[in-house]
Amino acid sequence: MAKAPIRARKRVRKTVSDGVAHIHASFNNTIVTITDRQGNALGWATAGGSGFRGSRKSTPFAAQVAAERCADAVKEYGIKNLEVMVKGPGPGRESTIRALNAAGFRITNITDVTPIPHNGCRPPKKRRV
């Protein structure tokens, strides 16, 4: 039985005017994901994936570079306006927002969505250096 030839599907680039930038700023790394309004990921970048390793991942500059790389990845979608959702206490919170603003996006709203426990799990013990 002959198989039908497999055709590669053309990837259709959709144009999105408004997007949502999800910034996950932990103490060790920063993850930047830009989605459309429905939550479908359009592009993402991390400080670790941008060439920073070890303790340099957890710097504001690494978060800035990750935001610039993520912005370059989603330029082809035609996003003009961004709503920013920041999660976590990490050092890359502010520098990521500044980098997205400098990349040419108009930031319409900044929301802090850091999960706060209503006395849930016990936190890690304090460091003794």
UniProtKB/Swiss-Prot annotation:
Q: What Pfam families does the entry give?
A: Ribosomal_S11
The secretion signal range is: none
InterPro entries the record matches: Ribosomal_uS11 (IPR001971), Ribosomal_uS11_bac-type (IPR019981), Ribosomal_uS11_CS (IPR018102), Ribosomal_uS11_sf (IPR036967)
Q: Name one GO molecular function term.
A: rRNA binding
Write down the Gene3D superfamilies for this protein, in alphabetical order: Ribosomal protein S11 (3.30.420.80)
**Keyword Ribonucleoprotein among record annotations:** yes
A single GO cellular-component term from the record reads:
ribonucleoprotein complex
One GO BP annotation of this record: translation
UniProt keywords, alphabetically: Ribonucleoprotein, Ribosomal protein, RNA-binding, rRNA-binding
Q: Say which domain of life the source belongs to.
A: Bacteria
**Function per UniProt:** Located on the platform of the 30S subunit, it bridges several disparate RNA helices of the 16S rRNA. Forms part of the Shine-Dalgarno cleft in the 70S ribosome.
Q: Which family does it belong to?
A: Belongs to the universal ribosomal protein uS11 family.
Q: How does it assemble?
A: Part of the 30S ribosomal subunit. Interacts with proteins S7 and S18. Binds to IF-3.
Report the protein name in the record.
Answer: Small ribosomal subunit protein uS11
